[in-house]
Curated annotation (Swiss-Prot):
Taxonomic superkingdom: Eukaryota
Transmembrane intervals: none
Taxonomic placement: Eukaryota, Metazoa, Ecdysozoa, Arthropoda, Chelicerata
Entry protein name: Alpha-scruin
Function (record text): Actin bundling protein found in the acrosomal sperm process.
Classification via SMART domains: Kelch
Expression sites (tissue/organ): Sperm.
Length: 918
């Protein structure tokens, strides 16, 4: 086999680096001649409804495409992957609708195209995505439906189950579109841009969840785009080039060289350095964390689309665009499919030949050559392809009758046919027959097993048991130290193929939770995009004492082993709890604890969603239900008969191994017993303070979503459901305690940015007057303290626990047991007593003359604690109360008053003392 002559690599450094850059106006070439068909298709005929129905009926019953092209009923991908090609249009004969309805299958080991089936409707310039043994066909033009000679874009979604060869119509997209593109990531399918039937270029982005058959609208592309290349790399989706609109002259369009990056977890867009020249109707794949851009089109001197033959490699980290090699024939509007180290380039349009092309080429990354493969049965452009992986491991393929591109001259002695198929053809035929028999036998056994379980009754229970056994086995594999091999070495490990478990764990769980699940509502706040750098937290400022800084590798690994998007399990302590019927007691105030993280098991996000209820007279914790999303180091407040949860870390979102702060606001209404997502804060926050003052909710300070400490303050308007910026603190800080007392908002201690070698722990006190909107200094604390908690009890401010810097040179945080009180007469902070367990990042709640201290981190034990304590203010005693079900830190708690006040505060304190006193 001849080798492709490897050309010299020419590296063009794009301005900038791997950092995100601000938007800048880039010179683009305006033109109104951006038809990807190069104007060859002048007009399409309009069909009557009867003609459309007859055409669809003939195609549905079709058993062959044309003489000489064999049809197959099975993919036959037991040992090697195959490529499916869907639809497209032949520019020479655009009214042959069978071309746009056909599905062809390509077997690389045989180098042969076969007719497979037909689609439910003809499509061209559509997009496909493969997920969980199903191929989804999204949108595209329907040649059967034309208006004024133009094909109409569609919003349909068709699903092909490749094993059974059955089509099914799924939920439509929100927008009809063609010339769009899709990518599959994290069990979701994302659709970007496109063009509608009116010729308008779209910026809309939608996300499809196959298991739920549901579409969600996401943040739009900063500019309308069609004909862009799409690829995902390390959790970020790249939208490369395309055709955009001119804002001043909407009917005209531009070729764009911009690269937009979309972060699905945060629903945000960023910019990367641009391409060296405008490019549209290209294709992109990801290999070795680099993005390969295949062909495309730019503008000629006459202002017409001109196909290009360049294959370039974009390195997102270095910001370089490296020319790798060239196609023999320049092309655009082609389709690509990647299987392992091979990339197949199918069909497309060529301005050189001024027509659609039937070429199929394969790029072999290991040998760095491009090989010609068998031609498509018909020349097609606007085609979409999907790579179907092999069902079982087997010897990887080699294109048998490959002809290298003309730029790669054949070497003497090269053979056009693979040795595997030239030697012993009888053995090959026997192997093919044996594979078919074995495949049908496995299907028969599987069907028989399912029927047997259904006949036994309670099939759901047995299925759940089987699923639990599989998950337990994978967890044991993970704990035993297994690490996945690289993809090309791990293909044969069928036992470790990720499993897809939809809706696991079931929500709501087996406990009768009164909480209702909330769908994530994507908001599109107006934010200026630009460079963002994540600032990791120093060890001297980490409340978790560095125990979670290096968990990202294991976290991602366990998700891969389990095959789950979220590693979550039902808490083991659920069986010990009786489900609470209501969150509010009739006569006694109760304490509600939300979220948190177990430092021993940070990957279990069920802990971060849990809500506990503590009844003081029963001295008992009860499991109440789940929050909509897991949170830790968030803030909570009781406001207008509802529980408000703001900000906090989301364990599912990590950057550089650290959890990322959020800006969400979740509200639980006591009357309706429902969770609702309200308006997001203007700034993402964790380790912040949330309190109510003069019937206004305030969020103060914290750490934002790029790791910086913030000084901003926000207030929430309940009527307009919006957050408003207040006067900022004099300096940024996080981990401070906050109370409302004496007409001021008091901020006690906390951490500030590390600008010197001095420890960042603060001892100062700030007081904010919301009426006159100014900050004043209060009396400093007795010692510098961070991650403490404060409460007002008996009309005094009490500061409980916290962390102070160590006395050695490292200045690491050390938990302190002190309980300090502010004496307003002497204006001094005095230590009143000490806790039995030093702790910081705990929850402190005042209940009449009682202070409850629960959870937190104990630096002396280097772990979170489940021990809880009660400080009786009236008699200055500390009692031990019922422990938390698990050691948690980063919780947030509120006190829920009773429905009707029955006891006086003195009586309630006496009853509590009688309950907890031995």
């Amino acid at each position: 086999m001849a080798r492709y002559r490897k050309p010299e690599r020419v590296t063009r450094v794009i301005s900038g680096s791997d950092e995100y850059v601000d938007f800048k106006k880039i010179d683009e070439e305006p033109t109104d001649k951006l038809d990807p068909n190069l104007g060859i298709i002048k007009s399409m005929p309009k069909l009557e409804p009867e003609e459309i129905n007859d055409t669809l009926l003939r195609q549905t019953n079709l058993r062959s495409f044309k003489p000489g092209l064999s049809a197959v009923n099975d993919l036959d991908n037991e040992s090697t992957p195959v490529v499916l090609a869907f639809g497209g249009i032949n520019t020479a004969r655009p009214d042959e609708y069978l071309n746009s309805s056909s599905v062809f299958v390509y077997h690389p080991d045989r180098n042969k195209w076969n007719f497979y089936t037909t689609m439910m409707e003809p499509r061209t310039y559509h997009a496909v995505g493969y997920f969980h043994r199903r191929v989804y066909v999204f949108g595209g033009y329907n040649p059967l439906h034309c208006r004024k000679g133009k094909m109409q874009a569609t919003a349909t979604t068709f699903q092909l189950t490749v094993q059974t060869k059955q089509w099914r119509k799924r939920a439509d997209m929100r927008y009809a579109r063609a010339h769009h593109n899709v990518t599959v990531m994290d069990e979701r399918i994302f659709v970007f841009g496109g063009r509608d039937s009116n010729g308008e270029i779209l910026a809309a982005v939608e996300m499809y969840e196959p298991e739920m058959d549901q579409w969600t609208t996401l943040a739009s592309i900063p500019e309308p785009m069609m004909g862009s290349a799409i690829a995902n790399n390390e959790g970020i989706i790249y939208v490369i080039g395309g055709v955009t609109t001119n804002k001043e002259k909407k009917p005209e369009g531009n070729l764009s060289n911009k690269i937009f990056c979309f972060d699905p977890l945060n629903n945000k867009w960023y910019r990367k350095p641009s391409l060296s020249s405008p490019r549209a109707f290209s294709a992109a794949t990801t290999q070795n964390k680099k993005i390969w851009i295949w062909g495309g089109a730019n503008l000629s001197e006459e202002g017409l689309l001109s196909s290009i033959d360049s294959i370039d490699v974009l390195d997102p980290k270095k910001g370089t665009l490296e020319h790798h090699m060239n196609f023999e024939l320049a092309k655009h509007c082609h389709a690509v499919a990647k299987t392992g180290a091979h990339v197949f380039i199918v069909g497309g349009m060529s301005s050189v030949e001024a027509s659609a092309i039937a070429e199929t080429e394969m790029y072999d990354r290991k040998r760095n050559i491009i090989q010609r493969c068998s031609l498509l049965p018909v020349a097609l452009t606007g085609i979409a392809v999907a790579a179907i992986p092999a069902d079982t491991g087997g010897e990887y393929y080699e294109v048998p009758t490959s002809t290298p591109s003309s730029k790669a001259k054949p070497q003497p002695g090269s053979k056009p046919t693979s040795v595997k198929y030239k030697k012993q053809p009888d053995i090959h035929e026997r192997n093919e027959a044996a594979k078919k028999v074995q495949r049908r036998w496995r299907r028969y056994i599987e069907q028989k097993s399912i029927t047997k379980r259904m006949q036994q009754g309670d099939s759901s229970g047995s299925t759940m048991l089987e699923g639990n056994d599989r998950i337990s086995g994978r967890i044991r594999t993970y704990i035993s130290g297994y690490r996945p091999l690289p993809p090309d070495q791990d293909d044969l490990s069928k036992e470790l193929v990720p499993v897809s478990i939809p809706f696991w764990p079931p929500d709501p769980d087996t406990t009768d939770s009164v909480f209702h699940t909330v769908r994530d509502q994507y908001r599109n706040p107006e934010e200026q995009m630009g460079f963002k750098h994540f600032y990791t937290i120093p060890r001297q400022m980490d409340p978790n004492l560095g125990m979670l800084l290096f968990m990202d590798e294991d976290y991602q690994h366990s998700k891969k082993v389990l095959g789950l998007r979220s590693v979550e399990s039902v808490p083991y302590y659920i069986n010990r709890f009786q489900a609470s019927g209501t969150i509010q007691d009739n006569t006694i105030p109760v304490i509600i604890g939300t979220g948190g993280v177990d430092l021993r098991d940070p990957m279990n996000i069920a802990y971060g969603r849990s809500v506990f209820q503590y009844h003081p007279l029963k001295d008992r914790w009860e499991f109440f239900g789940y929050m909509p999303q897991p949170r830790n180091y968030h803030a909570a407040a009781y406001y207008r008969s509802a529980i408000y949860i703001t900000g906090g870390y989301d364990p599912d979102v990590r950057t550089w191994g650290e959890m990322v702060a959020t800006k969400t606001t979740f509200v639980y209404e006591l009357a309706s017993k429902n969770w609702t997502r309200m308006g997001d804060m203007r700034c993402a926050r964790s380790h912040h303070s949330l309190l109510v003052f003069n019937d206004v909710l305030y969020a103060i300070g914290g750490r934002d979503d790029i790791g910086r400490l913030v000084s901003s303050v926000e207030s929430y308007d309940h009527e307009s459901n919006e957050w408003t910026m207040e006067k900022s603190m004099p300096s940024p800080r996080m981990g401070m305690a906050a109370v409302a007392h004496g007409g001021y908002i008091w901020l006690l201690g906390g951490l500030t940015s590390m600008t010197t070698e001095e420890p960042p722990v603060l001892d100062d006190v700030l007081c904010y007057d919301p009426v006159f909107k100014h900050w004043v200094d209060g009396r400093p604390l007795r010692i510098g303290r961070a991650f403490g908690n404060a409460a007002v009890c008996d009309n005094k401010i009490w500061l409980c626990g916290g962390a102070a810097p160590s006395t050695d040179e490292n200045n690491y945080l050390v938990s302190v047991p002190a309980i300090d009180v502010y004496d307003e007469e002497t204006m001094e902070w005095k230590q009143k007593t000490s806790l039995g367990c030093p702790r910081h990042s705990a929850i402190v709640v005042a209940l009449e003359s009682c202070l409850y201290i629960a959870g937190g981190v104990n630096s002396h034990e280097l772990s979170a604690t489940s021990r809880n304590e009660l400080y009786m203010v009236d008699n200055d005693t500390i009692q031990t109360v019922r422990e938390l079900p698990i050691p948690l830190t980063g919780m947030a708690a509120v006190t829920i008053p009773p429905k009707c006040v029955t006891f006086r505060s003195e009586s309630l304190s006496i009853m509590i003392r009688h309950k907890v006193t031995p």
